[in-house]
């Protein structure tokens, strides 16, 4: 699915999930048994993050301040599926893994300029530095950042309110409620 979606967007390279990498967690969303979306969370380690290839200077700033970093990579979602709930569920579970299970403080994502506004508006990311070329996909990329405590505040405030989101235009109302998050986090921690 990743190669199909990336090729459709004109990105170069072969993209595969790294099942044998203990610092990467890949999730998928299914609809009636068919995978409709996938995303990977990379946890910082001595080998670093994929974003270090072009944004190491910016990531090192957060490391130097004592941050524990993670990154979102390999997001692919079937464009025929218009489900904010499915997309929000994938992101919420990623944030649970990052913050609650791996105790990360900061999350990063490299995005094509055409997707930057989505992440800023829908998930509260902020742009860092200047645009650079990502050699893994041979395309321009921005490095976006979000503080996971800030993400958690938004989840606590808006999660589970999609039936009455008010003026909130982000994905956070489609995230799980706090009670649902607690149950999911307990189950994820119990399986290791």
Where are these regions (language model features)?
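Short amphipathic alpha-helix that is part of the acyltransferase structural core
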Residues: 1-36
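Intrinsically disordered, low-complexity acidic/polar segments
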Residues: 36, 48-50, 81, 118, ...
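Acyl-donor binding region in acyl/amide transferases
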Residues: 54-150
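Charge-rich, low-complexity intrinsically disordered segments
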Residues: 139-192
């Amino acid at each position: 699915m990743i190669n199909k979606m990336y090729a459709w967007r004109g990105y170069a390279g072969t993209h595969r999930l790294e099942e044998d990498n203990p610092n990467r967690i890949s999730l998928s969303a299914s609809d009636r048994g068919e995978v409709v979306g996938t995303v990977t969370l990379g946890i910082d380690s001595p080998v670093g993050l994929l974003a270090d290839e072009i944004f190491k200077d910016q990531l090192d700033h957060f490391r130097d301040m004592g941050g524990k970093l993670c990154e979102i990579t390999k997001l692919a979602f079937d464009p025929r599926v218009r489900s904010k709930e499915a997309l929000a569920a994938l992101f919420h579970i990623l944030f649970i893994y990052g913050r609650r299970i791996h105790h990360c403080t900061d999350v990063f994502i490299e995005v094509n300029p055409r997707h930057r506004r989505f992440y800023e508006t829908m998930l509260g990311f902020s742009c860092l530095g200047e645009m650079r070329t990502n050699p893994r996909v041979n395309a321009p990329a921005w490095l976006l950042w979000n503080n996971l405590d800030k993400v958690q505040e938004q989840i606590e405030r808006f999660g589970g309110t999609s039936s009455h989101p008010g003026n909130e235009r982000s994905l956070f109302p489609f995230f799980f409620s706090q009670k649902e998050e607690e149950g999911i986090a307990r189950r994820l921690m119990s399986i290791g």
